[in-house]
Amino acid sequence: MTAPILKVERVAKTFLTESGAIEALAETSIEVRQGEFVAVIGPSGCGKSTLFNIIGGLESADGGRVLVGGKPIDGSHKDIGMVFQEESTFPWRTVIENVAFPLEVAGLGRREREEKAMRFVRLVGLDGFERRYPAELSGGMRQRTALARTLCAEPRILLMDEPFAALDEQTRMLLGEKLIEICTALKQTTLLITHNLSEAVQLSDRVLVMSFRPGRIKRVVEIDLPRPRTSDVIASEGFAGYLGTIWEELKAEAAKGLQAIEGQKRMPPPA
């Protein structure tokens, strides 16, 4: 078995708040191998986004480490590309100018970067829209632009934090199919943070289920379903079985999250 390209070793994080310390992550460990698509799913407040930020170098961990290709990293890293839930396209740039931005930063000439950027514009299905501005695009098209921009930098690892959460269900499913098509074509190693069970099963080779706070990996579910995961696969008993398995693991953790929210509501306001 090949060594993991991404390894998260016993990463921990605690936040200090007015009401006391909150342990967000407790010695969380993850391994992702080359070309693998792995989803991390958990209840609200389990530390998924904190984990995303630590792997992406946006936050520091209190303990543990992140390794890429066997080497520890500290802070943002050129081998990790990130796609966020929030709108991240540059409104003053066209689609192709958005996609080519990493190449511009790297110092490539205009012709060379546009030629390379067009490859990724086509890959995400936006050819014909390359001269449009984000305001002229749908939400799904803007997310495809953001994805193409990230992939244009050719990261070894694609890190995604609920990239389709703001989109309607039909668009989510279509973009999910497009994402898998792209990742398969590029043999792209991908780690997806999500709260959507169907999305996790549809896209992933493995699903990592997180516990409620402090977050840690509670169970790893291997998804043994044929690809491409067409509507027939999604409607199958096997798909439903994986949904049931993951939900059984999540249910108690989600209940803990709701209890924590109710407890916060009952707390008296600070003096």
Where is each model-derived feature located?
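The feature captures the beta-strand-to-loop junction immediately N-terminal to the Walker
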Residues: I41-P43
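Catalytic Walker B motif of ABC-type/P-loop ATPase nucleotide-binding domains
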Residues: L158-D161
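Conserved ABC ATPase "signature" region
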Residues: E104, R111-F129, E181
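A short, proline-enriched helix->beta-strand linker immediately N-terminal to the Walker B motif
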Residues: C152-R156
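Conserved ABC transporter NBD signature motif
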Residues: G64-S76
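Conserved ABC ATPase signature
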Residues: Y133-L137, M141
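Helix-to-loop junction immediately C-terminal to a conserved catalytic motif
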Residues: G56
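Short coil-to-helix segment of the ABC ATPase nucleotide-binding domain corresponding to the Q-loop/switch region
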Residues: R93-A100
